[in-house]
Every structure is written in structure tokens, then in C-alpha cells.
Amino acid sequence: MRHRIKGRRLNVTSSHRQSMLANMAVALVMHEQIKTTLPKAKELRPYIEAIITKAKKADLTVRRSVLSKIKDKKAVEKIINILGVRYKDRPGGYTRIVKSGFRYGDLAPIAYIEFVDRDINAKGKKMYQDASEEIKN
């Protein structure tokens, strides 16, 4: 029985899991939407939501606490200055998980995890411009 056991192992060591969650959190913050497997998305959701809830206070202690979880300074700045302000009045539920079928190679369930009320231009603005230029040509 797995009573009182929190989280998923994801078939990796604990240090690998912590590093992976931190890296996925940076990617989610910078792009505001990422594609990953469903169990990883479900594990990332409480990790990033706790960080954003802390970031709504936006003082030095919170900044240091967020920096201890996420090692990227640009991501921490975005969390404190943009996401903390954006979700100031929202009492949780900052992310959504959208199931997206199965991966071709191993049939792993794939999902998108994204911020609610996200900035559409945050994810690959240059990529969208290149695609629109190709359509025009």
C-alpha cells in the first residue's frame, strides 16, 4: 500500500527528478506552454503552482526562496515581476493540462501544460513570424 507517499517516482533517482522538475519549470515559465508526458505534467503542476503562489508576495525572502527552487535568474525575474502580478487575484489554479494523444515510439501519453490566461506571444514569437512569412510566399 502506498499510503502517505507523495509524488511520482518517474523511474529516475530523486536528484534527477528534482533537477528535471526545475528544468521543466524554467521551460514552462519562459515559454508559458510545454509538451511533455502526462505523468511529468501532473508532477510539475503542484511544483510550479506553489512557486507562483509564493511569488505573489514579491519580497526579497520570496525571491531567494524561488531562486533556490529554480536556478535560472531570468525565469525568477519573470515569475516575480510578470506571473506574480498576473495571478495576484487568482487563488490558485494557474496551470492547465491538456491531453494530446500518445507518442509514436512508445505510446506514452502526451500532454501540454500551460498557464491559464497565458501570453500567446511568449512561446516562439519568431517561430510564428517565420511561419506566416512562409504562408505568404
UniProtKB/Swiss-Prot annotation:
Q: Known PROSITE patterns for this protein?
A: RIBOSOMAL_L17 (PS01167)
Enumerate the transmembrane spans: none
Q: What's the superkingdom here? A: Bacteria
Q: Please indicate if the UniProt record lists Ribonucleoprotein as a keyword.
A: yes
Key words of the record: Ribonucleoprotein, Ribosomal protein
Q: Say if the entry is tagged with keyword Ribonucleoprotein.
A: yes
Q: Which Gene Ontology CC terms are recorded?
A: cytosolic large ribosomal subunit
Q: Name one GO biological process term.
A: translation
Molecular functions per Gene Ontology: structural constituent of ribosome
Task: State the family it belongs to.
Answer: Belongs to the bacterial ribosomal protein bL17 family.
Subunit info? Part of the 50S ribosomal subunit. Contacts protein L32.
Protein name (record): Large ribosomal subunit protein bL17
Origin organism is Rickettsia typhi (strain ATCC VR-144 / Wilmington)
Which taxonomic lineage is given here?
A: Bacteria, Pseudomonadati, Pseudomonadota, Alphaproteobacteria, Rickettsiales
